[in-house]
Amino acid sequence: MIWEIPIIGDFITKPFKAAKLYEFYDRLHLFTVYLLGFFVLLTGAKQHFGNPIDCMLPKQHDDLKSWRDYIHNFCLFYGTFRYDVSNGTSEFGSYTEDASVNYYQWVPFFFAFQVCCFLLPFWCWAYMQKLIYIDMAFIVDYSGKINSEKTFEKTKEKVDRIVNYMHDHFKFRRAHKMGYLSWITFNSAFPSVLYSLTKLFFITNVIIQVNLVCKFLDVDSWTWGFDLLGKFIHPTPRAPEFSSFSDKQRFAAILTDGSYNRFQYFPILVGCEYQLQESVSNFVNHKAQCIIPMNVINEKIFIGLYFWLLVLTALSVIGTVKWILRIKSKKLNEVMIYKLIKKSLEREPFDSNIHDHRYNFVHKYLCADGILLIYFMMDTNGFLKTEEVIGALFKKYCSDAGLEPLQTAPTLTSSPRDLAYSETNYGFAAPQKI
């Protein structure tokens, strides 16, 4: 299968492997990838293995299978045209700019292109995660498996491992700020900035996709979906004198009232003009009446996709605004983390410095990147598993802070030569000589 090809498989599945670092609104875009993939298979199977077009041919052409197959394939890939309806009668038109219908053969490829477009923000976010100094995806994944062990000792061992890993990164975060770029990549706000850019990328992409659908169907207004929905709900009634029409007038009325061509962008009954060489020097033009059964499917798919993209745009904007307000609100972050460490506080004896430890834990120890990580853990693993890990992390922080209170931002030691090495002083304890 294509997934087993090393380069292609990694290129496609990489966003799904990093799918743990998303919130609910981002996973809607991942759902859209699956939805569009299903549309690719559905329309592609109908077009390449089904019966995408049927034409009513003259007897001399229909009797010869080679000619019949040739004409059907020609009309499918070269394109068709709409009927010209005027003055209550219909007649064959021609391949004019307004009448031509030639998008339907590209529908599976268009959906495949959209799949790549929706995967692009996930690919970018998966790459940007490598720029973050802490492996958030590993922490979220490992935290979700802490209760998979059968014994309490094994579970506690897993919790201690992940807590020690997180503690080392948060405690010594600034030890790596030695270069110009490191002041950016090791800044606590850097992961939040990258994730905010990713969310803006999601919004930009879905807005572009709405416009691409309109361009692909050659519609002038982005409200075409509402027009089509209105025709479904309130179809145009037939004229009272329909029963007295001639056959040609009835056929024209059917074309205009929507029984076969409910909406002009998805015509079912079309015409096709083809040329056959019936002798060495004799080329004869023919016109055939055709139906496009796949447009029945395309009509439902595109109207559903149109409204889903509009809903997705609205939800993405709401989710991004909520995310920015949430990550910027000190009060909300404090309340969220206090709930996670509440159980740990109840089990410990009263400490007069606990309020200072709690505040420093949120704003000087976790900072913006730690808070972002906790949001990912809660969205993926739930409250209980996150509570167990963060509660243990807070205990470890307090055990260190109780002996070595964290008061100020770390500074480099002023006399590294006297100490035989240079290190970052975090305010926990004075560095000892070797």
Swiss-Prot record:
Lipid bilayer topology: Multi-pass membrane protein
Domain of life: Eukaryota
UniProt KW Transmembrane helix keyword: yes
Keywords assigned by UniProt, alphabetized: Cell junction, Cell membrane, Gap junction, Ion channel, Ion transport, Membrane, Transmembrane, Transmembrane helix, Transport
Alphabetized GO MF terms: gap junction channel activity; gap junction hemi-channel activity
Compartments, as annotated in UniProt: Cell membrane; Cell junction, Gap junction
GO BP annotations listed: germ cell proliferation; monoatomic ion transmembrane transport; oocyte maturation
A Pfam family matched in the record: Innexin
Family per record: Belongs to the pannexin family.
Protein name, as recorded: Innexin-14
Organism of provenance: Caenorhabditis elegans
Lineage: Eukaryota, Metazoa, Ecdysozoa, Nematoda, Chromadorea
Gene name in the database record: inx-14
